Amino acid sequence: MSNSTFRSNCGLATGLDIIGDKWSLLIVRDLMEGKKTFTEMRLSKEGVATNILADRLKSLSINHIISFYHAADNRKTKYYFLTEKGLELYTIQLEVMRWTYKYYPEQASDHIEFLEQLSHNTTQKDRKSVV
């Protein structure tokens, strides 16, 4: 996303322009939970359409939140991973998950173990061990 596509110079608006759609942080969550391929992410419970997933992966890559490498045995297979920039989204995810767990606990049970793991990993070194 180039600077000309941002709505304003507001930090919140710019952040939402980059990761504020309903899929980007779920992709980041999946990568933090250990998913690495398009297929693994496509099979997530939320059911993202393949065209949307491809678009979000491209956008996250353009914005240097994720990167990828090709499998040695099959150039069509890409393994995605979080960059340093992507790893820093950890705190945003943690706070959104805490908020949801507090106010909508019945909707927050699927990833409670992940939330607990994130809550206990507070240093950057520890965050990398989550991935």
List where the protein language model places each region.
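Short beta-strand "wing" residues that participate in macromolecule-binding interfaces
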Residues: 68
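N-terminal helix-turn-helix DNA-binding core of bacterial DNA-binding proteins
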Residues: 10-52
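C-terminal regulatory/oligomerization modules of transcriptional regulators
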Residues: 91-131
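Glycine-centered, phosphate/nucleic-acid-interacting loop/turn motifs that mediate DNA/RNA or nucleotide
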Residues: 23, 64-65
